[in-house]
Amino acid sequence: MAERDHYHTIDDPNVPCNFYDTVNLTGHTVFPNGSYDYYGTIVPAELVGTYDYIHSSLTERIEVREHVRGCVCKFKSCLNICCPWRQVFNSEVDGCIIDHSDNRTWPDPPMLNITFRNDSTILVNMFAQFAIQSFRPCPKMFSLQPETSHWDDYLLFENGSMLRVDDQQLIRKNEFCMVPTYVNESDMFYTIHPANCDMQDDNSTVKIINAYAMMFSIPFMMLTIAVYLLIPELRNQHGKSLVCYLVGLTVGYTSLCYVQLYQVDATGDACKVFGYTAYFFFMGAYMWLSVISFDLWHNFRGTRGINRFQEKKRFLFYSLYSWGIAVVFLAFTYIAQELTNLPAYLKPGIGDGVYCWLDMSNWAAMIYFYGPILVIVVANTIMFIMTAIKIHGVQREMARIIASENSTKNLRTEKDKFGLFLRLFLIMGITWLTELISYFVGSDKGWSKLFYISDLANAMQGFLIFMLFVMKKKVKHLITNRCSSVRDGSNQRQSQYSTKTTSSSVANLSLHEKPSVEKPLVISSSVDPQKTTIFR
């Protein structure tokens, strides 16, 4: 709050009022007594001053030629518009322009619902009710459109301030501006709504923390992938599925980290590339999670867990299923964003000039991301429950009969796998389920703070998976054996190379020596010929 107050108080002491309470009087009628007529509002001489600067944003002051400004907001409520009336902001020129190709109708006069001190709400003429300022508080503005989402509901007050309903944030008049908006491309008229800044708040802070947590997590996922690829005993069906799952998470995390930490231009092609890449690999990862759940259930479906297909064919089928469905989701999302005229609140939002990732402020995230993941989590839960029931049934059956040693060992092995991947499911399923809940209550700042911990845990999944799948006793033993075998193999190869080199040297030497015929080689009878090595 102190920083926001700073925006309202800092200014030149030689001017009659703060810049944000002024309007530019250049070109307006001046009276002999020094007062000015500003669109029918008389600005007294004592509230007129010469300014040699402007504020191009809330934080940036620019020196300009001296010009006259009047403190009209000192005696009349002001309302800020982002661009002069009938002009729109153009990102290519980074300024306001008159768009002659735009055929939409501007409201004349613009009517706004204003809430007064007595809590009454009245539809008023914007130009009659307020003195109009034109100022863009920050480079990136986000318009509120209550027609598309109740999270965009707001209240405009008679003093020119605004209440953002979803988080009950009171926004001062110079921290937002009114902008012409439309819902559908086919709309032929503008509606005037406020646009607010992407201010640094608790939510953006959490995004930064999550990004660094993901960076911390990525090396652990890569280590887990390396361990499961390099150790033959771990390259079974479940191990290969885990590797594919981690590949999806690693690429997805890397893409999101780059977007969040390096501030990728939301209007550029790189934004779309990172956004769609992250989406594809995240969806692929969750399809592999469903594969793991299905394969565990499949192994317990029969009393002896007999596989129907050879492991290689089954892995190929699983790969086509997981990555294939991820491609289908990617195509569906891309078409919805790039090739349709859907309303903005039904588009994914990837690379739309505002977001590189999905738009989390409306139902788009539910349709294209959280919805499919919710289905996967529910399906995984059902399969895990069915597998647990089957394990319990097999245990009871084996307790009633004399089980063979192999059957008991196989059951124990499958139980270990089930327990391991059950913990993986708990890490992934429950964490993402809490994130789904946080998505629904995210507009309520009081509730959403409860999910900051789950968001952080979600971002640190790589570390948790590394501890679960690599730091277990059996895997560490396999790593030790693998390192020992590699070291022994290296020593053995070195020894063989040394032996061959020595043999070759002696052989070469014998070619240059004259054979001794006077003194033939004699082996002493005291030496066992079977244990004697002879180099000629």
Curated annotation (Swiss-Prot):
Extracellular compartment segments: 1-210, 263-273, 336-365, 439-449
Cytoplasmic compartment spans: 232-241, 295-314, 387-417, 471-536
Disulfide-linked positions: C17-C71, C73-C78, C82-C177, C83-C96, C138-C197
Matching PROSITE patterns: G_PROTEIN_RECEP_F2_4
Chief localization: membrane
Membrane topology: Multi-pass membrane protein
Regions that span the bilayer: 211-231, 242-262, 274-294, 315-335, 366-386, 418-438, 450-470
Pfam family, one: Methuselah_N
GO molecular function: G protein-coupled peptide receptor activity
Keywords: Cell membrane, Disulfide bond, G-protein coupled receptor, Glycoprotein, Membrane, Receptor, Signal, Transducer, Transmembrane, Transmembrane helix
Outcome when changing N481K: In strain: Yak_5
Residue numbers spanned by region Disordered: 487-506
Positions annotated as glycosylated: N24, N33, N103, N113, N118, N159, N184, N203
Compartments, record wording: Cell membrane
One biological process term in Gene Ontology: cell surface receptor signaling pathway
Biological role stated in the UniProt entry: Involved in biological aging and stress response. Essential for adult survival.
Listed PANTHER family: G-PROTEIN COUPLED RECEPTOR MTH-RELATED
Subunit structure: Homodimer.
Family designation: Belongs to the G-protein coupled receptor 2 family. Mth subfamily.
Protein name per UniProt: G-protein coupled receptor Mth2
Gene of this entry: mth2
